UniProtKB/Swiss-Prot annotation:
This is 7-methyl-GTP pyrophosphatase. SUPFAM superfamilies: ITPase-like. One of its GO terms (molecular function) is nucleoside triphosphate diphosphatase activity. The keyword Cytoplasm applies. InterPro entries: ITPase-like_fam, Maf-like.
Amino acid sequence: MGLELPLILGTSSVFRREQMERLGIAFQAASPDFDETPMLGESAPQTALRLAEGKARSLTGRFPEALIVGADQVAWCDGRQWGKPMNLANAQKMLMHLSGREIEFYSAIVLLNTVTGRMRRHIDKTVVVMRQLDELHILRYLEREPDAVYCSCALKSEDLGALLIERIESTDPNALIGLPVFRLVDFLKNEGVEVL
């Protein structure tokens, strides 16, 4: 039955769409309609998983018979959650603060089968240690990588953001970009979708 269901990626992120396209399987991207406001007292992994689940569930009305992928990422450093800076000034401040620090990125992924109601869930933790950065390097990076303002912690690790990183600890290098591909492939296989 899984083979007959369309695959929907619940995201407005161009980066997650690009990751999915690299898998070479047919899918449709749809922007979820879901309130992503943080909840008081929620841990970073809890937030990431709640948002991934909410994104997937928000699309069930539009896609009542589908496999829906929801994903979200939350960064944690210095006792607080960090998001996307969304503009140059915020990105500069954020990167200056994160210089030389260790950041934990929690990338959650869910696969919802809307026919059976089964939802598979996973959270991938990636630890990133940032290099010591100065204002000049940050400005150069943001000039050459303007889309970084739409990335968690302004860190576009798949491109020039890699130059800001001293070390990465992860079981899935794709997770830092936003989509834990290794687990997604397992989830799809369990639903009868062969990627290879």
